Amino acid sequence: MFVYHKKINKNSEKTKKYRPQMTEGNILKGFILFAIPLFLGSLFQQLYGTVDLLFVGNILGKNDAAAVGSSSILVTCLIGLFTGISVGAGVVTAQYWGAKDTDNVTHSIENSLFIGLIGGIILTGIGEVLCGPALHWLSVPETIMDHAVCYLRIYLLSILPMIMYNMSAAILRAIGDSKTPFLVLASGGILNVCMDALFIGFLDMSVAGAAFATMVSQMFTAVVLTVFLVQREKLLGNKWKIDLNLITKVITVGVPLGIQSMILTLSNLVVQYYINGFGENDIAAFTIYFKVENLIYLPIMAFGQAMVTFVGQNIGAGKVDRIKKAALECNFFSAVVIGVLSGILLLSGRGILKLFCSDEEVIAEGLKIIHISFPFYFICAILEVTGSILRGAGKTLQSMVIVIVSLCGFRIIILKVLLIRSHTIQAVATVYPLSWFCAAVLFVGCWMYYKNKMDFYGAF
């Protein structure tokens, strides 16, 4: 990876503006304070899908809930590449910020937004063309196919707003602002609830209403956050310069993460394919479970995002020892927090599942999944934080290989083996903790290998 140190007049106002915020002070305190808005922001982001499911599952029924769950994962797959590229933009920007290179911070923001805009337009077109065949490939039951196609075609219009929001949020986090994305998402979450009530409850628009509600909310958050970023960094008065060298740096870091995200999503599509073969109750149970597990996974993601920014800024500032210390403190803290949280949710699983669906058969299947996976989520915290150290330092290729091997290849192989032995929903659920353990071992091993090697840190 590249670390860039540029001599700048430390007394200049612009340099003060770009003073890094995670390169000094108490490590764990700074990590926690930065991660809290990230968690809250991700929580509100999940409201888009969760509120849709609450309205769909309780007002329209389990078939429509299954239609929403079996189709929305395709959007995740499509935007996976640009999710990684947005992280790459954040890593590059964070290192420039840590090095106090204000000119390249500005250029990084401009070129990252350009990448997001073009990519979002292209992916929306691809999604609209492929959505029908993709749902058939997933073996979505014919009883819910029409509703799944209807939901997906409208939902695909959210791709461009999602990408632009993710890009803007990643950049703001890179320069130390995790609060603004949260506030924008909170507003978008409230808007989403209102739109669901209008489109589903009042106008009776079925799954189309759920998709429209999400689209409107995503557009709102994307426009507000992107405009805020452009105005805050005073980009409107600048002549934007498309810098192919900088775009290459962002893509070099981001594409492996994007490929990682896409392949991971594809492996989840394979799992979804097997889930779809169990029937409507199990499809609905897994759809609801994936919403409930977000209460655990969202703080894990927040810890990982905070670590990426922390590592990026400290590498830019040349403070390697802080990274080594953070690896121990933040991993321990994250594992303890997630262990306690998963235990609480495990004890209250039935009540939480009932919020999403009143069907007792679906709840019973959901509880089977929870009892298998929730006790092991602390492993997921360790793999995410350790992997984020590597990603923040630019070792994105290594991260990609580990994820492909453990969370994709190993997961699918184990799934097939377990289903041969026992064709049950419990067999499907078991693949998750097993693959987490495999990934955690590989990530920790990779970190131990690189942490004392100088080639862990490169130069722009």
Residue spans for each PLM region:
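Short alpha-helical transmembrane segments in multi-pass integral membrane proteins
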Residues: 1-35, 93-158, 202-255, 311-376, ...
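Residue-level signal for short hydrophobic patches within transmembrane helices
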Residues: 24, 28-47, 51, 74-81, ...
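Transmembrane helical elements of multi-pass membrane transporters/channels
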Residues: 33-52, 154, 165, 188, ...
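Helix-terminus/linker motif at the lipid-water interface of multi-pass membrane proteins
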Residues: 47-66, 135-142, 198-205, 262-295, ...
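Alpha-helical transmembrane segments of multipass membrane proteins
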Residues: 50, 125, 167-171, 190-198, ...
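Interfacial/gating helices of multi-pass transporter permease domains
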Residues: 56-76, 142-150, 207-208, 249-253, ...
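Small-residue-rich hydrophobic transmembrane alpha-helices
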Residues: 65-125, 162-181, 285-349, 380-403
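Short runs within selected transmembrane alpha-helices of multi-pass transporters and secretion channels
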Residues: 86, 154-173, 181-189, 210-225, ...
